Amino acid sequence: MHSESDDNTAGGTPGSEDPQAEESSSPAEEFEEQERKLAPEDSTVQLIHTGCTDKRPATPPGAHPGQGFVPPEGGFGWVVVFAATWCNGSIFGIQNSFGILHMMLVKHHEKQPDQASQFKVAWVGALAMGMIFFCSPVVSMFTDHFGCRKTAVCGAFVAFIGLLTSSFATTLGLWYFTYGILFGCGSSFAFQPSLVILGHYFRQRLGLANGVVTAGSSLFSMGLPVLLKKVVEPLGLPRTFQILSIFMLVQALLALAFKPLLPSGMCPMPGMALDGGPSTPESASRWQKGLAKIRRYFNVRVFSILTYRIWAFGVATAVLGYFVPYVHLLNFVKEQFGDTQREWLLLVCIGASSGVGRLLFGKIGDLIPGVKKIYMQVASFILLGVMSMMIPQCAVFEGLVVVFVLMGLCDGCFITIMAPIAFELVGPMQASQAIGYLLGLMAIPMTAGPPIAGLLHDHFGNYHVAFYLAGVPPIVGGIVMFFVPLVHQRMQKRRKETDDPSMDKMLKNCSNGDMLPGYTDMETHI
């Protein structure tokens, strides 16, 4: 029966008006003819031909889900959570305790009186914090190419070398390189994979996982000030750096647990590379392949998403004054209240409240759908700015405790919800690039904040103006970020209005067998 049909088809003359010849033409040929007639609506025909509806969760433009990948939501993921907790805690515990290191560095240079010493010493900690974020776009490329495990292990080892060599430095110039550059860059390569790897093991409970990681790391922010003030400081600055380097050596070992579940070679969609760009044919020239590889690792596709651009700009604006209290707090307390011997308690308070905030807001973030999570960051940044302005108004030490408890809660909310928002805006396949570019945009303002505050202190003789001005950027950034969910909602409404109104009619015709001549109703449906 098939051979007869084939013979008739082969013997038929194109353009023949013999009805018997028309009946003997194969269904495939008639379908191809019909498809050519419907060329302007080619994508719709392909949808009907597959006979199935797309039931994948909606993703932002340019974001691809990765062939229905479902994270395990636990299991070995909790080991990864522990390793990520140590990573976040050791890095940001050291950074948040830099106020004590700052005082030790200033004391080390007291024999060389310099009116701008606060400005120069502040650059040591600011460089380290800035490099963590400045290197993030490069870290994204390394993470995509080499994976989370190799990137994090190498980064932690570089940070270990930076802290160890800092113990032998004797000048600010050397500390700029060993602590600011080496430790900062190594921390960046160790830190960012710890954010990305959580998305490989959690999705529904990603906010909780981030909350556990960041809350556990707050224990370091609480314990390290006590360790530095009561135990390490009497040993001197060199021993301090040597002891801190042990934390990063342990991190290099724990990072071996960062086993990715989304391999770099997996393509999320047919014909697409991992980053969402078009795949390069085998016959392409060497130049084209080179350009394709460059486009992959310097992928700026995330910036085509308007909501991501607004969010990234708002966060980068807000962090200009974010790190100022951590660096200059202890010197401010010493000038405002004298030698109270209790100033280190403020770092413990901000670490403890930040841990509570990360657990609390991590769970709350899982309950808030979609991009509306950004409203949590909006509130935290605005309150953070107001609290920064309140610091000079505190006439008693207990007032500072209240202010820094609230600032810790805001810090916990901002840190915990950052990765889930990135996943919501760009999807899991581009989350690494999105986080990397965001942290890179944060680098310059976060680095510039503490030295500017030190310069204002040297000019005015106190920290009042510095803390007042440090509160302005978080408020402005929060206002900018407020519009992200509104823009997202407007874009969704516009996409619904521009949907093809004839789709329902075409599906109805298809169900009657009209769309595919030569096929039965059941065959058309299949």
Curated annotation (Swiss-Prot):
GO process terms (BP): brain development; central nervous system development; chordate embryonic development; locomotion; neuron differentiation; oligodendrocyte differentiation; optomotor response; regulation of thyroid hormone generation
Location of the protein in the cell: Cell membrane
Disruption phenotype: Morpholino knockdown of the protein alters the neural development in embryos.
Matching Pfam families: MFS_1
Enzymatic reactions: 3,3',5-triiodo-L-thyronine(out) = 3,3',5-triiodo-L-thyronine(in); L-thyroxine(out) = L-thyroxine(in); 3,3',5'-triiodo-L-thyronine(out) = 3,3',5'-triiodo-L-thyronine(in); 3,3'-diiodo-L-thyronine(out) = 3,3'-diiodo-L-thyronine(in)
GO molecular function, one term: thyroid hormone binding
Sequence ranges on the Cytoplasmic membrane side: 1-73, 143-156, 200-207, 264-309, 365-377, 420-434, 488-526
Compositionally biased tracts (Low complexity): 16-28
Keywords: Cell membrane, Membrane, Transmembrane, Transmembrane helix, Transport
Stored PROSITE patterns: MFS
Membrane topology of this protein: Multi-pass membrane protein
Family classification: Belongs to the major facilitator superfamily. Monocarboxylate porter (TC 2.A.1.13) family.
Subunit description: Monomer. Homodimer. Homooligomer.
Name assigned to this protein: Monocarboxylate transporter 8
Species in which this protein is naturally found: Danio rerio
